Amino acid sequence: MKSGIHPEYVTTQVNCGCGNSFTTRSTRTSGQITVEICSNCHPFYTGKQKILDTGGRVARFEARYGRRKK
């Protein structure tokens, strides 16, 4: 491997909008990253995600192609 071509890999503090913070490693030289959503407040990870049948698309698909057999 060539020397001197790889970026410096430093410890970085990640701060979320919900107040959660954690430490990781990154090539970002400032040592700080601010994010809006993390795994503590994202609906997918918190279990608050809702799957909506928008406009009957699932029902229309099932009517065309039939229900999937389990």
UniProtKB/Swiss-Prot annotation:
Organism: Saccharopolyspora erythraea (strain ATCC 11635 / DSM 40517 / JCM 4748 / NBRC 13426 / NCIMB 8594 / NRRL 2338)
Function description: Binds the 23S rRNA.
Pfam families in the record: Ribosomal_L31 (PF01197)
Subunit description: Part of the 50S ribosomal subunit.
Transmembrane segments: none
Any GO BP: translation
Keywords of the record: Metal-binding, Ribonucleoprotein, Ribosomal protein, RNA-binding, rRNA-binding, Zinc
Cofactor or coenzyme needed: Zn(2+)
Cofactor details (free text): Binds 1 zinc ion per subunit.
Family of the protein in this entry: Belongs to the bacterial ribosomal protein bL31 family. Type A subfamily.
List of residues binding Zn(2+): C16, C18, C38, C41
InterPro entries tied to this protein: Ribosomal_bL28/bL31-like_sf, Ribosomal_bL31, Ribosomal_bL31_A, Ribosomal_bL31_sf
GO terms, molecular function: metal ion binding; rRNA binding; structural constituent of ribosome
Name listed for the protein in its UniProt record: Large ribosomal subunit protein bL31
GO cellular component terms listed in the entry, alphabetical order: ribonucleoprotein complex; ribosome
